[in-house]
Regions:
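N-terminal Sec-pathway targeting helices
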Residues: 2-21, 25
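Aromatic- and glycine-rich peptidoglycan recognition patches
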Residues: 10, 28-36, 146-204
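N-terminal capping segments
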Residues: 24-112
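...with weaker cross-activation on analogous glycine-rich loops/strands in unrelated enzymes
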Residues: 105-170
């Protein structure tokens, strides 16, 4: 009788651990993935920041033409991540980048020191970590990966105590447009806790 009870207890523990494990991973899925994207079509407006829309692009590699402003400024390929950040800066800040081309990771100039002017983008450039904390409106630049060698860009939508919320276009077919990253001050510098983020750009 005692052996049966022990076996049942062990089974109960195993089941409980499985439930806890599933709940943790389900929470991560809910935080990072958007099941409603099953119903989106490419070009649907799915989010916005200060009146500037984020459009659904489906798979990361998808392109449906180039967005060029009425005055001839190259905004980018629809609806890549670069297209959104450039359109945001163009519409909200009335800002045109002197160099309007390049992949996402090319927005960051590795030759510059923290706080120097990035002349290609006509924006101040800060490295991650930086002596200057990120703020709303900053353009985050992410390095490339084996899956995505071109990098990624997003906009800081909001700064809260110890964290930032970003908004992005073309994160992937089922990824959310918003993400939250922790921000910590380490040795006098502000660090966004995401190893892919190499730095950020800011309108001076």
């Amino acid at each position: 009788m005692i052996k049966i009870k022990r076996k049942n207890f062990i089974k109960f523990i195993i089941i409980a651990l499985i439930i806890i494990f599933a709940a943790i991973h389900l929470n991560k899925l809910v935080q990072n993935y958007n099941i409603f994207s099953l119903f989106y079509e490419v070009g649907d407006s799915i989010d916005s920041l200060n009146g500037v829309n984020v459009y659904y692009n489906g798979k990361v590699s998808n392109v449906i033409g180039r967005n060029v402003s009425k005055d001839g400024y190259n905004i980018g390929q629809k609806y890549q991540c670069v297209e959104f950040v450039k359109r945001y800066y163009y519409e909200y800040y009335k800002h045109k980048m002197p160099n309007s081309y390049g992949h996402a990771k090319d927005f960051y100039d590795i030759k510059l020191s923290d706080g120097q002017m990035n002349k290609d983008r006509n924006l101040l450039q800060y490295e991650n970590p930086s002596i200057v904390a990120p703020k709303a409106g900053d353009l985050l630049v992410y390095g490339g990966t084996l899956v995505n060698p071109y990098g990624h860009v997003s906009i800081v939508a909001e700064v809260r105590d110890g964290e930032i919320e970003i908004i992005q276009q073309n994160p992937g077919a089922f990824r959310k447009t918003r993400r939250v990253f922790k921000v910590e001050k380490q040795n006098g510098k502000w660090k966004i806790k995401n190893d892919r983020i190499i730095g950020w750009l800011r309108k001076g």
